[in-house]
From Swiss-Prot:
Species annotation: Thermosynechococcus vestitus (strain NIES-2133 / IAM M-273 / BP-1)
Name the UniProt record assigns to this protein: Chaperone protein ClpB 1
Annotated segments matching region NBD1: 160-341
Compartment list: Cytoplasm
Entry GO terms, CC: cytoplasm
A GO BP entry: protein refolding
Domain remarks: The Clp repeat (R) domain probably functions as a substrate-discriminating domain, recruiting aggregated proteins to the ClpB hexamer and/or stabilizing bound proteins. The NBD2 domain is responsible for oligomerization, whereas the NBD1 domain stabilizes the hexamer probably in an ATP-dependent manner. The movement of the coiled-coil domain is essential for ClpB ability to rescue proteins from an aggregated state, probably by pulling apart large aggregated proteins, which are bound between the coiled-coils motifs of adjacent ClpB subunits in the functional hexamer.
Length: 871
């Protein structure tokens, strides 16, 4: 049996009462008594446990005492039913009286808890045992309820709403859990100024993502705690509203609005003591709106206008425009505070302020040069994000990487471990051998193993010692930080004795320990070769930038410097002749990697001019293969596809309102994903002249704005354009160097006739490719044969051509007008097809060497090398 009329109770209170018969049955009791209700309330983990915690009681102790009392009651083995006991009946009557005292409409959990104070059967004794008086209980209930009344059947969601749906930033600042905020004084001062107004005292922080809007609110919280604010803001609480928690779990219509109203009521009832901070304030507009329902923004409006609610908002420029500007009534209630991206110098100061926090967290040191590098390199190479966020991320990731290296086994030790494993496997197999040579080898191996194991244990001991000291340093630094926070708290509370005791006692001792640990680490590192690095340097930051963007930022390693010095030779392995073109491209790369290129323009921009088939596109491919080890790093755009005026939208993206607007452009998307690339615009004369207007910004400033309004950075690209314009003039003077300048002028005239001067004027160099000579064609034959050889290597077939065969192919494939392409066709016809047929006939097998020569009939002959050897 249960008490009647659930409509008198709130949902949670009725759920607790409805659970009591089950608990009584489990305990084999026939009567429902007050102890069963207490057990039910404690099982809920809801308001009852909150009240006891607020009153300073141990919930677990109350649970244990309740269970103990229940277990002592007489049991009935098979109770036919359960009946309402006297104690519970009286308790419910007292709860009804408590409801009337509080002026509520329903009996709630707190009324039931309060009724236990007068319960003669169980409650009084329980509260005596745990030392809880009715007065303390009432105070705890009052603190949780605040000024809320029970006006519906689900009031618990509205109690201590700010505690549930907000983070107290001032409390976090007192505990030292917020990162220090450096600079931003003007913005914080403006926020304080707006908050001090009589009406419309609501600043909204607007700025790009990552510039530090939330940090300004945290900075204000720190100032409030440090009492570095005007009297109007002294001892105020700054609470960040968690919109996610507010919306989460609001199942019924109107539940979200009720929660928000409860939060706003607490704020207004505090008479200006509480300042609300809503991060991502645009989420408030439209939040909780269903058909015909008010959204959260409309609930805020009246209070914002009257000055009852002091609220700081933060949102990005785009979202402010999209959501808040559309709602003019909401917009006028907020005063805008623009937060700009800090300069590189300011970012360095911010990083210096945060340095200690990151050092303590990761347990590594961060050098000042690393901080400067993080600010300068991120500003230069990461264009789609904002300072200081991107610089802080760099430092954080570099420190995390170093910490990971410290905790994992050093490379030297790892190599020795592998070597020992290898030798032990060899020893096992040698032990089974009986020959004298095997025994000698075994003896030698045993000696080698003993030496290696000795070295292994020495390195292991050193690694553990270094790691131990580094960990100790981290724990001492953490201790120092805790003591510093305690000192600040003592000074704020004017407990100067405690502050002095900590400052001149504990802190001095910790600094002494820190100095000792640092000296010990230096001793280990200087005495023996150091296995671990414990400091983040400029090189670490450069490495992280390279991982993020693919741009080689790190200082040149000697091997890479040598590789760059021989860049021309590398390119000539693929591109025959064309010395001017190859050296111009090589010099541009050398300038860039040595750090002498103009940082505000592309690395280099070229127009390759010349007849077809002389190596213009091949040079671009060779360059991409050299720089990125793959030809696929070449962003190739065939300009013959851009013959119409409107085709430019394919490069930078379709304008708003057109199909494909969200997809971005072929060129801009490729460079956003891979900012360090070789961009090849093939056959530029085929494109519509208006398409080249896009190139003006790319070539001059190294950037272009796509259809979405994003700036795409071309400063780390090499731009190569190829064209056949004027190729007839180049062919006319083939092999005649004396007429070169005349030919160059005529080609440039043809270019000027076709392209606009403002486009041509922005290109770094015009490089003319000459038509190929016969001796160069022989080299190309050898290159093409090498490629064919690679394809045959899968079948282990080797290809060998005599000098006569090479001359024959060069002669057949020579055509000055078409360059090297006819040669490719000749090799296909004269060499590849006959070999393919011979393999299919079974003339050649895997592992054969095919000798290619010119037969008496002036055609290529094919035979096995082995046959030749036996003749």
């Amino acid at each position: 049996m249960q008490p009647s009329n659930p409509n008198q109770f709130t949902e949670k209170a009725w759920a607790a009462i409805a659970r009591t018969p089950d608990l009584a049955k489990q305990a084999q009791h026939q009567n429902l008594e007050s102890e069963h209700l207490m057990k039910s309330l404690l099982e809920q983990e809801g308001l009852a446990t909150q009240i006891f915690q607020k009153a300073g009681c141990s919930v677990q102790r109350i649970r244990d005492l309740t269970d103990e009392f229940i277990s002592r009651q007489p049991k009935i083995s098979h109770p036919s039913g359960v009946y309402l006991g006297q104690s519970l009946d009286k308790l419910l009557d007292r709860a009804e009286e408590a409801r009337k005292q509080f002026g509520d409409e329903f009996i709630s959990i707190e009324h039931l808890v309060l009724a236990f104070a007068q319960d003669d059967r169980f409650g009084k004794k329980l509260f005596q045992d745990i030392g809880l008086s009715e007065k303390v209980l009432r105070e705890a209930i009052q603190q949780i309820r605040g000024s809320q009344k029970v006006t519906d059947q689900n009031p618990e969601g509205k109690y201590a709403a700010l505690e549930k749906y907000g983070r107290d930033l001032t409390l976090l600042a007192r505990q030292g859990k917020l990162d220090p905020v450096i600079g931003r004084d003007d913005e914080i001062r403006r926020v304080i100024q707006i908050l001090s107004r009589r009406t419309k005292n609501n600043p909204v922080l607007i700025g790009e993502p990552g510039v530090g809007k939330t940090a300004i609110a945290e900075g204000l919280a720190q100032r409030i705690v440090a009492r570095d604010v005007p009297d109007s803001l002294r001892d105020r609480q700054l609470i960040a509203l968690d919109m996610g928690a507010l919306i989460a779990g609001a199942k019924y219509r109107g539940e979200f609005e009720e929660r928000l109203k409860a939060v706003l009521k607490e704020v207004t009832d505090s008479n200006g003591q509480i300042i609300l901070f809503i991060d991502e304030i645009h989420t408030v507009v439209g939040a909780g709106a269903t058909q015909g329902a008010m959204d959260a923004g409309n609930l805020l409006k009246p209070m914002l206008a009257r000055g009852e609610l002091r609220c700081i908002g933060a949102t990005t420029l785009d979202e402010y425009r999209k959501y808040i500007e559309k709602d003019a009534a909401l917009e006028r209630r907020f005063q805008q505070v623009y937060v700009d991206q800090p300069s590189v110098e300011d970012t360095i100061s911010i990083l210096r302020g945060l340095k200690e926090r990151y050092e303590i967290h990761h347990g590594v040191k961060i050098s000042d040069t690393a901080l400067v590098a993080a600010a300068t390199l991120s500003a230069r190479y990461i264009s789609d994000r904002f300072l200081p966020d991107k610089a802080i991320d760099l430092v954080d990731e570099a420190a995390a990487k170093l910490k990971m290296e410290i905790t994992s086994k050093p490379e030297e030790l790892d190599e020795i471990d592998r070597k020992i494993l290898q030798l032990e496997m060899e020893r096992l197999s040698l032990q089974k051998e009986t020959s004298a040579a095997s025994r000698d080898r075994l003896e030698k191996l045993e000696r080698e193993l003993a030496d290696l194991k000795e070295e292994q244990s020495r390195l292991n001991a050193q690694w553990q010692a270094e790691k131990e000291v580094i960990d100790r340093l981290q724990s001492i630094k953490e201790e120092i930080e805790k003591v510093n926070i305690e000192i600040q708290q003592a000074e704020r509370n004017y407990d100067l004795n405690r502050a002095a005791e900590l400052k001149y006692g504990k802190l001095t001792e910790l600094h002494k320990k820190l100095a000792e640990a640092e000296a010990k680490l230096r001793e280990i590192q200087v005495g023996g070769r150091s296995l671990l690095r414990d400091e983040v340097t400029e090189a670490d930051i450069a490495e992280i930038i390279s991982k993020w963007t693919g741009i080689p930022v790190s200082k040149l390693v000697e091997s890479e410097a040598q590789k760059l010095l021989h860049l021309e030779e590398e390119l000539h392995k693929r591109v025959v002749g064309q010395d001017e073109a190859v050296s111009a491209v090589a010099e541009a790369i050398q300038r860039s990697r040595a750090g002498l290129a103009d940082p505000n323009r592309p690395i280099a921009s070229f127009i390759f001019l010349g007849p077809t088939g002389v190596g213009k596109t091949e040079l671009a491919k060779a360059l991409a293969a050299f720089m990125f080890d793959t030809e696929e790093a070449l962003v190739r755009i065939d300009m013959s596809e851009y013959m119409e005026k409107h085709a430019v939208s394919r490069l930078i993206g379709a304008p708003p309102g057109y199909v494909g607007y969200d997809e971005g452009g072929q060129l801009t998307e490729a460079i956003r994903r891979r900012p360090y690339a070789v961009v090849l615009f093939d056959e530029i004369e085929k494109a519509h002249p208006d398409v080249f207007n896009v190139f003006l910004q790319i070539l001059d400033d190294g950037r272009v704005t796509d259809s979405q309004g994003r700036t795409v950075d071309f400063k780390n690209t090499i731009i190569i354009m190829t064209s056949n314009i004027g190729s007839q003039y180049i062919l006319d003077v083939a092999g005649d160097d004396s007429r070169y300048s005349e030919m160059y002028n005529r080609v440039m005239e043809a270019m000027r006739a076709h392209f606009r001067p403002e486009f041509l004027n922005r290109v770094d160099e015009f490089i003319i490719f000459h038509s190929l000579r016969k001796d160069q064609l022989r080299q190309i034959v050898q290159l093409q044969v090498q490629r064919l050889q690679q394809r045959l290597s899968d079948r282990h077939i080797t290809l060998s051509l005599t000098e006569k065969a090479i001359d024959f192919l060069a002669e057949v494939g020579y055509d000055p007008v078409y360059g090297a392409r006819p040669l490719k066709r000749a090799i296909q016809k004269q060499l590849e097809t006959p070999i393919a047929k011979a393999i299919l006939r079974g003339d050649f097998f895997d592992g054969d060497t095919i000798l290619v020569d010119v037969g008496e009939d002036e055609r290529l002959s094919f035979r096995r090398q082995v046959e030749l050897a036996t003749v």
